[in-house]
């Protein structure tokens, strides 16, 4: 790990804020803003710097001591260390703070841990003192730019934002923190939502109920420190003295939470700017700031100004030792809270990612003014960028068409604040279906019955929305899926995708299928190959989307990490062994063997025999003793039964006569939606398979046989080698060529892929493999 990044982690994350104390008589235990405790540093160093020896850790400590000094005055502090690190990464051009382009990746890694404002405000305060200046503008963009003008010129040609989650594409931590710091009373229920600690060095502190209470008390202390330091900056002696008394008896803070809220209310009424229709959102966003900061980023300006003023007061000697230590505590608590909302841990997989996603609005939920600011900051700030060509925002369909219409109305009302109508038109929406984890076996119900019902309800509300009124129709462009792939496979959404992609939407003056001139169909994106138990499993999921969901030219696969990851590096990362369910491994073996045969890249004889043997052993375990078959089922037969999974499983409960009749005359069904029960992908080939009773029985058992389900859910270890990795590599290349031929795009998301996947560096991202031809040119 980068030495500066590691040192920042130790002094602001690993060493608890409770250890910051000026008055400890024992020098060996003293830890404060100007003296990092050596014993505590060396205790934490092995987990942060495992590549270094004990002696090297000691050298790192003394290097930290040196780097905490101001090069002009020799004053030493953790704040100066932040400024010195920022000085290596940032530059001030006289107008704005920019990231040095040659430090871009370091800036990403370091600022991701603490937030950009943590460094930018410190850097700006130091520069303003040096240039005898005082910044008034704090509503700068959420993400600062680099100093590479050539890159800006390229980006100014136009950019499309094709994957924009409202809750994940904005300053989530800052919004929650500002709301919490202004509304700290009555928050116990919000902290109880945090079931476990997600940061490695804090997880044990949050996993028990009493520790969740401690986390709330910790944030109460931060709120008290913030209002106290704010009063110091503003010269409000009453709040300063009263809050100071409370800070001297920290054990009394939790029982005096209403008093802290009173301090905040006093500061709000005296200093806070009232935002039209929303009231005072942050007392640190002062009345005299609105002339310079009334834009889409205004909600961020108060906290930035507070950080800037505190850093400046420290550098100018206006804060005493106690106030400096309190600000150090505030930064530590702030960083801890941020780490429970922003994915700064290094765990891979979608579940970890999803746990963070669920927390995005815990502390602003129900606070309408802050919820509006979230939408305003997310949408309007992006739409106002001159180079933004289009913005594709993703939301879940409402439970009813009326609920959806109301949500679009609220969004549009906020977007209308962007005065330029052409900019407003850049925004459109994609409705995504959340994947839901399967429940236990229930007699007569297919796999993922709960997800199928929820998705069908969402589909019906979408169709009713389009039929209801064309006012917002032209704002909805497509459909997608979201949440964990491991919870349910593409087969669950197959019929819904085929149906929704075929309906005709009326954009103006009229409803679905009726009247008007502007008609179109919904576009399709499906998130697949992002999270998987094995690379083969991820590739099969991508193939299932193409086969079952009716994707065609112009459609997109979201992420598709499995399609581009280096199989050798992936399996090496997994120690050449993966753990998955027997059912998934059985499916994967049948799929990979048939893929290899189809593209003419059969593995060597030894590997082929090994894979076939594993298939037959698993098949016998799961199916052989639980179904009736007139002959020995081959790998090809099983693969054919897999091809039927795009069909609605309810069809396979019909008698043979009813099934064949329905297959022959699908148009005679009750509703248009039912006409899409059969998958039409390579229909002639699939119809031959459907007429085979033994293959139909396999598909029926897959869904409705309890013993098959139970046996298939057992876990198994699957060992692979370099020969298997080579086979996967060839299958990947063939699938990439197929995507090119069929005109299906891959929607890449480098930042979330880096967090979810096994790639260690951005230059390992599959996008370089997908675009290798043009890069080589």
Segments the model singles out, each with a brief description of its role:
Residues 1-777:
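Metal-cofactor-binding active-site regions of metalloenzymes
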